[in-house]
Amino acid sequence: MGETLGDSPIDPESDSFTDTLSANISQEITMVDTEMPFWPTNFGISSVDLSVMDDHSHSFDIKPFTTVDFSSISAPHYEDIPFTRTDPMVADYKYDLKLQEYQSAIKVEPASPPYYSEKTQLYNKPHEEPSNSLMAIECRVCGDKASGFHYGVHACEGCKGFFRRTIRLKLIYDRCDLNCRIHKKSRNKCQYCRFQKCLAVGMSHNAIRFGRMPQAEKEKLLAEISSDIDQLNPESADLRALAKHLYDSYIKSFPLTKAKARAILTGKTTDKSPFVIYDMNSLMMGEDKIKFKHITPLQEQSKEVAIRIFQGCQFRSVEAVQEITEYAKSIPGFVNLDLNDQVTLLKYGVHEIIYTMLASLMNKDGVLISEGQGFMTREFLKSLRKPFGDFMEPKFEFAVKFNALELDDSDLAIFIAVIILSGDRPGLLNVKPIEDIQDNLLQALELQLKLNHPESSQLFAKLLQKMTDLRQIVTEHVQLLQVIKKTETDMSLHPLLQEIYKDLY
């Protein structure tokens, strides 16, 4: 496995990761001494005392490097704060002008508003073959299997293409007064009646929604399908209650949900727009305007910007671990596992969950910080000197692809539970009960995705692939920390962060 990140001794007054996490699980006390990786979900910089970070007993025990090669840096890097502060009124005016210019260049991803419905929260034990699945939605025109939501209705590829060609080429068919029946085998016999059927069921050129559907239509469809499933499988009612419990726990555990984050990113909120940080001047202004949580400017003005940001992320990570731990305890069966296995599952799972939920705070241009009060641009983060400028780019690349799946909070609630209950983590003592719980969660996830995203037949397989991608991101993150270990001789790393990364990949 991987080497220990940081060879310095852990402060005798600090608990080990295992002891702290065990106490948190068994005694329901708040965990505040566990550290996690860079840029966790719901990131914010706060006023926690950083004296522990300045204690060099926690620093890397490495001889100073006399030379560091930064020749490959393409963007400018920034050295130390403080900077000379300009008159506040002048600074605000310049910021407003620059912000208008920058915001005009930012293309925020379209909102796909997360929505929760009890009808979408289903567990179902039996695995159904696609051909016999209750989720095989019929084409509204001919009754064939629908491939998605096209031109305002569920339609198969054949009828979608027929309608598109008719509209695009402005085709006029010979009138037929026979009112021909349109079904899978006869749909090509009478084009006039087929087109009339398309119009009758609601197909419209003004309702182009390839792969999407209105929320009202989705809820109606889910209600019909859920009713059918309940009649065929009475156990689904109990499973739905269980799924709702998971969703409720998710909402309680994670204050900044994807629904809230996307509302901020797309401007669909009554709250004040986030303060955009895109360069050093806007960063200084942001420190005055944003209620940062983990760093106060007066405490850390002497430190380099990249290090200040990195240290602030460490303290927010403590909160992230607490949130994830609380959620894990709500997963049915988790607290009944061996206590050592609970600790191991969280040790390996929290990183992957942090990056999963971090994606909710991101678009291709930047990331929300400080509980949505600020928005730090991707280019600014890349401009930080190496290796710090390299930390976030893999997370952005993952987030753009992950967000394309258009999951909502009800999907994520099950997905992160699946991540936690991974029976292949190294060092587990009793794998069987863990796999049993995960199998149930996987069945729940598969059915949830079929119900919530009926137009995306391959979504379950794509999401499972993301679990592999997340592990690769964690591995790359550990490798970057190894670089910091070798090059940043005066960089303090929280001792519990070293504990978590010990023997991790």
Swiss-Prot record:
ZnF (NR C4-type) ranges: 139-159, 176-198
Compartments reported by the entry: Nucleus; Cytoplasm
Expression across tissues: Highest expression in adipose tissue. Lower in liver, heart, kidney, stomach, duodenum and colon.
Keywords: Activator, Biological rhythms, Cytoplasm, DNA-binding, Glycoprotein, Isopeptide bond, Metal-binding, Nucleus, Phosphoprotein, Receptor, Transcription, Transcription regulation, Ubl conjugation, Zinc, Zinc-finger
Modifications the protein undergoes after translation, according to the UniProt entry: O-GlcNAcylation at Thr-84 reduces transcriptional activity in adipocytes.
Name the UniProt record assigns to this protein: Peroxisome proliferator-activated receptor gamma
Domain comment, as recorded: The 9aaTAD motif is a transactivation domain present in a large number of yeast and animal transcription factors.
Glycosylation (residues): T84
Occurrences of domain NR LBD (ranges): 238-503
One of the Pfam families matching this protein, by short name: PPARgamma_N
InterPro entries documented for this protein: 1Cnucl_rcpt, NHR-like_dom_sf, Nucl_hrmn_rcpt_lig-bd, Nuclear_hormone_rcpt_NR1, Nuclear_hrmn_rcpt, PPAR-gamma, PPARgamma_N, Znf_hrmn_rcpt
Activity regulation field: PDPK1 activates its transcriptional activity independently of its kinase activity.
GO terms of molecular function: chromatin binding; DNA-binding transcription factor activity; DNA-binding transcription repressor activity, RNA polymerase II-specific; E-box binding; nuclear receptor activity; RNA polymerase II cis-regulatory region sequence-specific DNA binding; transcription cis-regulatory region binding; zinc ion binding
Record PTM Phosphoserine, positions in chain: S112
Gene: PPARG
Primary localization class, coarse: nucleus
Family: Belongs to the nuclear hormone receptor family. NR1 subfamily.
Functional description taken from the UniProt entry: Nuclear receptor that binds peroxisome proliferators such as hypolipidemic drugs and fatty acids. Once activated by a ligand, the nuclear receptor binds to DNA specific PPAR response elements (PPRE) and modulates the transcription of its target genes, such as acyl-CoA oxidase. It therefore controls the peroxisomal beta-oxidation pathway of fatty acids. Key regulator of adipocyte differentiation and glucose homeostasis. ARF6 acts as a key regulator of the tissue-specific adipocyte P2 (aP2) enhancer.
Species: Macaca mulatta
Subunit structure: Interacts with FOXO1 (acetylated form). Heterodimer with other nuclear receptors, such as RXRA. The heterodimer with the retinoic acid receptor RXRA is called adipocyte-specific transcription factor ARF6. Interacts with NCOA6 coactivator, leading to a strong increase in transcription of target genes. Interacts with coactivator PPARBP, leading to a mild increase in transcription of target genes. Interacts with NOCA7 in a ligand-inducible manner. Interacts with NCOA1 and NCOA2 LXXLL motifs. Interacts with ASXL1, ASXL2, DNTTIP2, FAM120B, MAP2K1/MEK1, NR0B2, PDPK1, PRDM16, PRMT2 and TGFB1I1.
KW Cytoplasm (keyword) present: yes
Superkingdom of this protein's organism: Eukaryota
Biological processes annotated in GO: cell differentiation; cellular response to insulin stimulus; fatty acid metabolic process; hormone-mediated signaling pathway; intracellular receptor signaling pathway; negative regulation of cholesterol storage; negative regulation of inflammatory response; negative regulation of transcription by RNA polymerase II
Stretches the record annotates as Interaction with FAM120B: 205-280
Any GO CC annotation of this UniProt entry: nucleoplasm
UniProt motif (9aaTAD) ranges: 495-503
Cross-link Glycyl lysine isopeptide (Lys-Gly) (interchain with G-Cter in ubiquitin) mapped to chain: K252
DNA-binding region per UniProt: 136-210
